[in-house]
């Protein structure tokens, strides 16, 4: 494993912009799209993200609504250069910003004791978490996320809901491949009318690294308060699509007698036992390229 890690570091497999681009290229190839068509495809996905960021200019890093071309076509907008062959600067995460959020998680009894008004209460109906290998070259596939297939299934099972019962989604989206991977796992169109975010994602709202997960939970709590009795699903992400968290929320109380979060270790095998490629430190012979990306510096973009 140390040799494999060293090889990945040598070839840039630890750089998020490059790693997420591998998934994006795989999704493009899977769909059979040309590069031009795929750039417009991801631009249209992120149009809705920019719309949500524009609705909250007081907290968004880029609060201006942008078109698909402005977002995803290199240099359509001055300064929006190509980072890789599928991502422009505006498609990438902006995760070094000064932001914070806080959520108070407690029991009904303690909430009453603290005098928190009941119209502020939001209940957790389901939780789940999954983890994949951190080794990019050992991922089972790049056009889908086995973690999502397991995680979404488990969180919906705990909440006793189906995907049709969910009114709002907020999918952790540092790059456009993330809502597409979620759509694939949930068997939904990527342009689902409910959308995949509430506040604009990493690229438009901006986020303090993985701390964006807390911002998402706070935004979902507010959304649930405004739409009482409806359900929202939040997905968080860490590393390079390495760790995933899932939560379902609503102002509707969950029967306390049956609330029991499954232990992640009880279903980890569903991710861990999937067939994976075997690393060969001394390769020889013919090969098939599974996925690739092209990375640009300032002078070539």
Regions found by a protein language model. Give the residues of each.
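Conserved beta-strand elements of the Class I
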Residues: 167-168, 231-233
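Phosphate/diphosphate-binding loops
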Residues: 209-231
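Conserved "HGTGT" condensation-loop signature of ketosynthase/thiolase-family condensing enzymes
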Residues: 1-103, 107-110, 116-207, 222, ...
């Amino acid at each position: 494993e140390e040799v494999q890690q060293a090889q990945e570091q040598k070839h840039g497999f630890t750089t998020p912009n490059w790693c997420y681009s591998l998934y994006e290229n795989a999704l493009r190839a899977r769909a059979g799209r040309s590069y031009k068509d795929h750039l417009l495809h991801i631009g249209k996905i992120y149009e809705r993200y920019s719309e949500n960021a524009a609705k909250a200019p007081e907290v968004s890093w880029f609060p201006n609504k942008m078109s698909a071309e402005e977002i995803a076509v290199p240099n359509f907008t001055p300064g929006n250069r190509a980072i890789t062959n599928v991502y422009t600067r505006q498609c990438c995460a902006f995760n070094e910003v000064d932001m914070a959020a806080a959520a108070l998680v407690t029991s009904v009894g303690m909430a009453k004791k603290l005098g928190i008004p009941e119209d502020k209460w939001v209940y957790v109906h389901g939780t789940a978490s999954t983890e994949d290998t951190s080794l990019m070259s050992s991922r089972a596939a790049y056009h889908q996320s086995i973690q999502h297939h397991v995680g979404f299934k488990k969180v919906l099972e705990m909440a006793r809901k189906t995907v049709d019962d969910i009114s709002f989604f907020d999918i952790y989206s540092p790059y456009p491949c993330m809502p597409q991977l979620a759509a694939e796992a949930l068997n939904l169109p990527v342009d689902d009318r409910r959308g995949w975010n509430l506040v604009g994602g990493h690229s438009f709202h901006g986020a303090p690294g993985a701390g964006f997960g807390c911002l998402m939970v706070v935004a979902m709590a507010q959304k649930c308060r405004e739409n009482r009795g409806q359900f929202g699903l939040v997905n968080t992400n860490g590393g390079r699509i390495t760790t995933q968290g899932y939560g379902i929320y609503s102002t509707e109380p969950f029967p306390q007698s049956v609330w029991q979060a499954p232990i992640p270790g009880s279903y980890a095998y569903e991710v861990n036992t999937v067939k994976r490629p075997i690393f060969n430190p001394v390769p020889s012979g013919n090969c098939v390229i599974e996925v690739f990306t092209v990375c640009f510096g300032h002078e070539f973009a």
